[in-house]
Amino acid sequence: MDLTSWAIFPLLLASIGVYGLYKLLQKLRSGAYLQAAVVVITGATSGLGKECAKVFYAAGSHLVLCGRDEERLKDLVQELNNMRLKSTQLHKPHMVIFDLSDVEAVNTAAKEILHLAGRVDILINNAGISYRGTILDTKVSVDRMVMDTNYFGPVALTKALLPSMIKNRRGHVVVISSVQGKISIPFRSAYSASKHATQAFFDCLRAEMSPYDIDVTVVNPGYIKTNLSLNAVTGDGSGYGVMDKNTADGRTPEEVAQTVLRAVGERRKELLVAGLVPTLAVYLRTLAPTLFFSIMSARAKKRTKAKGFITNSNLKAKITVCI
């Protein structure tokens, strides 16, 4: 080793030590932030929402679990109450039953949430629906239904709870969006539109809430291995009942829930939780849009030919419910 190498070596060790100390302090702050925080989670009966309930409960948060299925929420509460953690004080969760697509029900639910918990520190807008179909064969009523749940529902609940957060000068709004809030792919028009609207709204909200010290985190996951496609219904209400390959190969909800927990604890502004190909697609859309459009066109042509999507009569819009 020459003199320069000997000089660099202690600097490198010092840098590693400083970084390690920074990560330790960050973890401690994150734990203190989540412990005893009042956390509201929509779509808590299954999938990512259910796993988020588990990890935030284990972190010591006070939970308000929201969904449409009372029995499944009761089962989740029982499961959480059966957890035993020596190092963390656990708090009995509350339940609020309502339909996110009903704005009046959302406003009533917000009042009930504040009555039960007294305040809301962290709101996790997780509930939503997914969609499959061609634009030509999709009724406007289907587009509206997707928008009601994925966009207007979270917007209504957020607006109803914001005054309380502003009054307390404390709050954190989280929305589970999608990679498709960043890019649009064929045969996902209603879903992509709802997630693009969600991305835009909460980006605006982040800026407008900064004077009040209220954080906003947008999480953009790719495919998650849940019952998303198994619970699908078609445009006429019949069941779809198929586990899509991309969904089956996706990340586990447990893994994504841990990522959400860390992102909230670190007060991240935005987070992309996706594999290499979707991540590259997001950057390609920005850096080389013409190439991205060509790839999407080729994808649409290939699938149209394979599926025989020619007339309005040969495709039913598929809607996947995840609430």
UniProtKB/Swiss-Prot annotation:
Entry's EC annotation: 1.1.-.-
Record keywords, A-Z: Endoplasmic reticulum, Membrane, NAD, NADP, Oxidoreductase, Signal-anchor, Transmembrane, Transmembrane helix
Gene Ontology CC annotation, any one: membrane
Catalytic residues of the enzyme: Y191 (proton acceptor)
Chief localization: endoplasmic reticulum
TM region(s), chain numbering: 5-25
Side of membrane Lumenal, spans: 26-272
Family classification: Belongs to the short-chain dehydrogenases/reductases (SDR) family.
The name this protein goes by in its record: Dehydrogenase/reductase SDR family member 7B
Organism encoding this protein: Xenopus laevis (African clawed frog)
Gene name in the database record: dhrs7b
